[in-house]
Amino acid sequence: MGSAGDDYEYVFPDISVENERLAGQHAGIKVGMGGRLCMAPLDLTRPNLRIFDGGTSDGYWLDDLKKELAHPETCDLIGGDVTGERFPTNPPPGVKLEVQSSTGPFPSDWLQSFDLVHQRLTLAGLGNQSEHCVEQLMSLVKPGGWIQLVELDNSSHEPNGPAVKTLGALVARLAEGMGADLKYRGGGMEKWVRDKGFIRVGSILAPVCMGAECPVPNMRDQTTKAFSFTAEQLIKACKRFPGGLKVMTDEEAEGLVGRLEDELRTRGGYFPVRVVWGKRPVDQ
């Protein structure tokens, strides 16, 4: 996901491998959130819910969320992404995928029409437009509805091994290279949501497991592969920025993926994601 425009280019271009990476990442984040995808206290037993997922890729989040809905067949599930290149030929049943940037503009009939608006791991790629993006997403929430935002937070406090710490540094370098101001971190998202008049604003810092730290055995290999591929693609992307990698030399980068894979299989690691939610007042 990124800013609007037909010339948007994904950092992770290999669609088949990227979908596998996203599945591993998704599984790790879900465990970190206690096995839940929706932390906002929305009543998922209600029929006819209308839900939007920004930066949806192939709609995997919405497809998994259906399992938490009591009446998914009655719900309107819409995923938007800045380009449709990752949309499958046959979308998940009950999920509609639309080419739509999260920075807007949105169709007028979408405004204040959704019970839940969700977006995950998108703001780092939007340069200095992160606050604008959040404001645009909030405009979709109906009175009494909820927004939920999920983004990486500072991982320096985690007792990770050297390879995982380097992965975190590469993520920060990617954000810097793409012009991100990172103001959404450290309470920024909560402030934006609250300043726009939303109420019942809450947040958690969810620990996302990788490799050997995953409590579910089959996730250890899945997340190891996913984050090793992430490191490989981050190296390629960051080398293209003016100034190059910065956080390591090209020589050090050559063996990082192998070192990371070994470290994840033997030691594992964690990175934190900030989950923020808020409710539009019924009279707003």
From Swiss-Prot:
UniProt-annotated binding residues for S-adenosyl-L-methionine: G197, F198
- Pathway note: Mycotoxin biosynthesis
Which keywords does this chain's UniProt record carry?
Answer: Methyltransferase, S-adenosyl-L-methionine, Transferase
Q: Which InterPro entries match?
A: SAM-dependent_MTases_sf
BP GO annotations: methylation
Q: Which GO terms describe its molecular function?
A: methyltransferase activity
> From which domain of life does this come?
Eukaryota
EC number(s) on file = 2.1.1.-
* S-S bonds: none
Function, in words: Methyltransferase; part of the gene cluster that mediates the biosynthesis of fusaridione A, a bright yellow trans-fused decalin-containing tetramic acid with antimicrobial activity. The PKS module of fsdS catalyzes the formation of the polyketide unit which is then conjugated to L-tyrosine by the condensation domain of the fsdS NRPS module. Activity of the Dieckmann cyclase domain (RED) results in release of the intermediate fusaridione A. The unstable pyrrolidinedione ring of fusaridione A is opened through a reverse-Dieckmann reaction to afford its ring-opened form.
**Family indicated by similarity:** Belongs to the class I-like SAM-binding methyltransferase superfamily. Cation-independent O-methyltransferase family.
Protein name, entry field: Methyltransferase fsdD
What is the originating organism of this protein? Fusarium heterosporum
